[in-house]
UniProtKB/Swiss-Prot annotation:
Coiled coil: none annotated. It holds the Pfam family Aldedh. NAD(+) binds at residues 244-249. GO terms for biological process: aldehyde metabolic process. Belongs to the aldehyde dehydrogenase family. This is Putative aldehyde dehydrogenase family 7 member A1 homolog. Gene3D superfamilies: Aldehyde Dehydrogenase, Chain A, domain 1, Aldehyde Dehydrogenase, Chain A, domain 2. Its EC number is 1.2.1.3.
Amino acid sequence: MTTFNEYPFLAELGIKAENNDGVFNGKWGGAGEIIKCLNPTNNKVIATVRGAAPEEYETCIQAMLAAKVKWALTPAPRRGEIVRLIGQAMREKIEPLSKLISLEMGKIYIEAKGEVQEFIDVCDYATGLSRSINGQVMPSERPNHILMETWNPLGLVGIITAFNFPCAVLGWNAAISMICGNVQLWKGASTTSLITLAVSKIIEKVLVENDVDPAVCCVLIGPGRTVGEQMIQDKRFGLISFTGSTEVGRRISSTVHGYFGKTILELGGNNAIVVAEDADIELVLRAVLFASVGTTGQRCTTCRRLFVHESLYDTILERLTKAYKTIKIGNPLEEGVLVGPLHTQSAVKEFTEGLEEIKKQGGKVVIGGNKLDISGGNFVEPTVVAIEHDAPIVKTELFVPILYIMKFKNLDDAFAWNNEVPQGLSSSLFTNNQKNIFKWLGPTGSDCGIVNVNVATNGAEIGGAFGGEKETGGGRESGSDSWKQYCRRSTNTINYGNTMPLSQGINFN
């Protein structure tokens, strides 16, 4: 039994109840296995998609190769205008698209709407960037010479995105990659196939209406073991951008770097908030609540570790427990709900098995810890656990709403505990002490790619570069100078004189 007819907004997005095409190479098709798209609120089928057959991969590549040169030669401001129009088209569909994200992914509606807005914001940012991407011009030591650099497209870019941000992460990558002059192949998570379809149809319409080869943005829906494997093995890609687990990212890294290809890897996070003794408790509580339970603990930047100074520990724990008791759990499309379901039943298993291991390692559940029986969906209670900082499980990432709380005496210890895990994505310090702030931001502070003060670990703005260090992968997406990763840099020396002087004063006469 399907739930398709309960959601009229699906038709607004061009989605059918059965056999939606899952391959786009300028034209829609799909000859592979049928994918059942589930609603995590009740685990009923929403609709079905026919995924890609292995042989359809090459049709996408050939279509991209055919579109590559013309798109690369299109002036960057014109490419930026196309991206602006994509953002505008997304803006016009923000309501039904946000509802679809809530329905298929499981995050609450207001967060889903924020995700679509993030895609729109990146398009706006990329549009402006299309008129300002540039290389440096540097003084030459030789007379009548110019030393400069140019940035050219990589050609083919592969974008593999995860279930938790099935719309925004495409925007981070595709909007920037497009203004840089690349053509892209997108493989979204199989469990969010309808979102992949809806976004792709919006992009396709803009490209066609503006006489751009729609193969500039191709799509393959299918499992990673087939579609993803074909992509990472293909040396024709100038870049593979992957968002997902550290385990899969490690394999992608070894494969792509094995043939000296380029990657952007956004992998696991094990993010911490450090609460100093002078912290503003009200700020702490608001930040921790959103950071730990937002998106049901399924953000890369979710706060998983909370280090609290001993003088504030009891107060923070008591008030945080009270706040957790007020959280409304349920259908993410219902107003007032703060926590929706986990995305899959396997995530529920990760939650229950993770708690068993936590207890074996001395952890004590302060609040939560239960699987919930709500409408047959993947619901669990957001959970707070008291545990030692060096318990082995604390160094792994459980992608569920479990928050570890730990007490410290010395701020230097808390800084060290923040850094002792293999991951290095996001971190935040709550303090009003200027010395501690700049120590936290400096070489002996946090070793993460995102280092905040008095804000949550999650909810990053698009203007900054997003990414982390260590086993988080080292890649950067979205803002700042992340655009450089989607380009090929060349250093140029131009002689406009009549002599041939050599650098470093060499005389080779």
